[in-house]
C-alpha cells in the first residue's frame, strides 16, 4: 500500500511539473490546481514539497509558480545522455576553441530560448550570460532561429512577445511586425541568424539551427563576440564558417 501511494505521489507531482512546462509566465495556485484537476489545498501541499526540492519556484511578488532551478539541472543532466545533444555540445566546444569566441547551446523552454551550455571565449567577455539565461525571442540571433525554424507553438509565443513589445508603437505596429517576419524569412532562407550590437550593445552573434531526427528544431548553436572581432556580414569569414557548419550538421544524418 505504501509503495502504491508513493508511486501515486510521483504521478501527481509529474502532472504539476508538466503543467508548469506549458506556461509562459507561471501559474497562480488556483490555476495550477484547475490545470491538474486537484483541490487547491492538495495542490498546495505538493508544490510546497516541490519547492523544497527546487523543482518549483514561486515568484515573491505575484505568488505564481514556475519550474525551479533543479528542473533545469535535470534537463541538463538528460542532455548528457542524448546523442544529438552531445554532438551539439561538442560542436559548441569546437567552435569556441577554433574561433576564440563564446559559443552557446540553447533550447526552447516555456520562458523562450534558454541556454543549456556555455563554451567560454578564449578571452572571456564581461557578459551576464550563463546556463539558464533566457534570450528575447524577437531581439536576438538565437531567438530568430527559433522563430524561423521552430514549431507553431513557438511561433505563437514569438507573436505574443512581438505584439507586447510593439503595443505602444501605434500606428506603426503592423509595419514593424511585417518587418520582423520578413527578417525571419531571410533567416530561414540563409539557414542562420545574425545580429549586430543587439540585444547587448557592442556584441555580435551568429546562430544556426540544430534539427532533430523528425526534422524539428532541437537546439540553436550561437557564436558570440565583440562587434570589432566577430563580423557578421554575408561574406565575412565567421559567417561563412557557420555556413560550413550547417553543411556538416546535415551530414550528421539521423542521430538517435
Regions found by a protein language model. Give the residues of each.
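Short glycine-/small-residue motifs
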Residues: 55, 115, 219-220
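Short, acidic, Ser/Thr-enriched surface-loop or helix-capping motifs
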Residues: 60, 108, 211-213
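Extended hydrophobic
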Residues: 172-247
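Short hydrophobic alpha-helical segments used for membrane anchoring or interfacial signaling
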Residues: 105-110, 118-119
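Conserved segment of winged-helix/HTH DNA-binding domains
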Residues: 70-98, 127
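Amphipathic alpha-helical regulatory segments at dimerization interfaces
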Residues: 19, 46, 87-98, 186, ...
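N-terminal helix-turn-helix
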Residues: 1-81, 247, 251-255
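Short, solvent-exposed recognition segments
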Residues: 125-199
Amino acid at each position: 500500500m505504501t509503495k502504491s501511494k508513493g508511486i501515486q505521489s510521483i504521478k501527481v507531482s509529474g502532472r504539476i511539473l508538466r503543467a508548469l512546462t506549458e506556461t509562459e509566465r507561471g501559474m497562480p495556485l488556483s490555476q495550477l490546481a484547475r490545470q491538474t484537476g486537484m483541490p487547491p489545498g492538495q495542490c498546495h501541499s505538493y508544490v510546497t514539497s516541490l519547492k523544497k526540492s527546487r523543482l518549483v519556484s514561486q515568484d515573491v511578488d505575484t505568488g505564481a509558480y514556475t519550474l525551479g532551478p533543479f528542473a533545469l539541472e535535470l534537463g541538463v543532466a538528460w542532455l548528457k545522455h542524448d546523442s544529438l545533444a552531445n554532438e551539439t555540445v561538442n560542436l559548441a566546444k569546437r567552435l569556441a576553441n577554433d574561433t576564440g569566441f563564446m559559443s552557446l547551446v540553447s533550447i526552447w523552454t516555456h520562458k523562450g530560448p534558454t541556454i543549456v551550455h556555455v563554451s567560454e571565449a578564449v578571452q572571456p567577455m564581461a557578459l551576464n550570460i550563463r546556463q539558464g539565461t533566457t534570450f528575447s525571442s524577437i531581439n536576438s540571433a538565437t531567438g530568430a532561429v527559433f522563430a524561423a525554424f521552430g514549431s507553431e507553438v513557438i511561433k505563437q509565443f514569438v507573436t505574443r512577445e512581438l505584439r507586447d513589445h510593439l503595443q505602444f508603437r501605434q500606428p506603426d505596429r503592423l509595419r514593424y511586425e511585417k518587418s520582423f517576419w520578413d527578417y525571419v524569412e531571410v533567416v530561414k532562407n540563409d539557414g542562420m541568424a545574425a545580429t549586430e550590437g543587439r540585444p547587448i550593445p557592442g556584441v555580435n552573434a551568429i546562430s544556426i539551427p540544430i534539427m532533430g531526427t523528425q526534422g524539428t528544431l532541437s537546439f540553436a548553436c550561437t557564436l558570440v563576440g565583440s562587434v570589432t572581432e566577430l563580423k557578421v556580414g554575408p561574406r565575412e569569414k565567421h559567417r561563412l564558417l557557420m555556413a560550413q557548419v550547417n553543411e556538416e550538421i546535415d551530414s550528421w544524418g539521423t542521430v538517435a
